[in-house]
Amino acid sequence: MKNLISLMLLLATAGSFGGELKPLRVGVSVDFRPVAFYVSDELQGIEVDFANKIAERLDRSVEFRVYQLDQLFTALEESEIDVIMSAISVTDERAARVRFTKPYMETGQMAIVRTEDATEYSKTGALTQAGLKVGVHRGATGEKFVRKEMNNPDVYAYPSVETGLGALRNSVVDLFIHDSTTSSQLTSSFVNDNLLSLNRYLTKESVAWAVHPDNPELQTALNLILADMIEQGEVQAVLKRWLPVVPVEL
């Protein structure tokens, strides 16, 4: 298995690196704790663990490159990176730009509210009332959900999650819609101790890695690695380490 994966990855990277086996360039966004985030100068998180496990199977190093979420796809298209590993939800729009691997996790959007408003927004129909001021992370699938599915909201799109949560803390918006993978972690931090994640999915989404559309060999190699990691129980172990809270199903 390891030799086959190494061969596939060598073929996938030969065109870009002139045949040399160089580090796998992994694009991440550090706005998504616990997906990828800094502790001092060290990157940690779900995707960091996965990337390192990939490297172990390939006897090669990983080069992490940090971007804003809405810059990741452009970086991939311009061959600045080889793969996006940033808890990316699979959508038809994104699939038109990249090749997705097989999914490794199911997730969804959740509402984050101020603690004093939690009872009100937990009521049936509270999130479907018209005219809510809703914060989102610009370019994330949460923004698409809010604009398409919510009832005529005033949408505030922020360049980072922390900026959006700051707006929620300061009552600029009524709630913030964000990915369940990181919502509970974000609201458990000291700075956000007056915020609460409503632990219920608003959507269901598949999460996968993304490679350049002209690189099917790398897609195949990563799918082989993913299958082996699932078989060995490593995917579930990583997710359990970083995601102790399981949201309520739709």
Regions picked out by a protein language model, each given a short descriptive name:
Residues T101, R114-K133:
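Flexible hinge/capping segments at coil-to-helix
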Residues Q71-T74, S86-A96, K148, R169, ...:
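A ligand-binding cleft/hinge motif common to bilobed small-molecule-binding domains
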Residues G19-I88, D92, A96, R241-W242:
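Extracytoplasmic small-molecule ligand-binding "clamshell" domains
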Residues L24-V28, T124-G139:
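Short loop->beta-strand "edge-of-pocket" segments that line small-molecule binding or catalytic clefts
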Residues S29-V30, E106-V113, S180, S184-A227, ...:
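Periplasmic-binding protein-like
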Residues T141-V155, N194-S197, A227-L250:
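Ligand-binding clefts/hinges and TM-proximal coupling segments of bilobed small-molecule sensing domains
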Residues T13-A14:
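N-terminal signal peptide c-region/cleavage motif recognized by signal peptidases
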Residues E63-T74, Y156-N170, E205:
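Short helix-initiation/N-cap motifs at beta->coil->alpha
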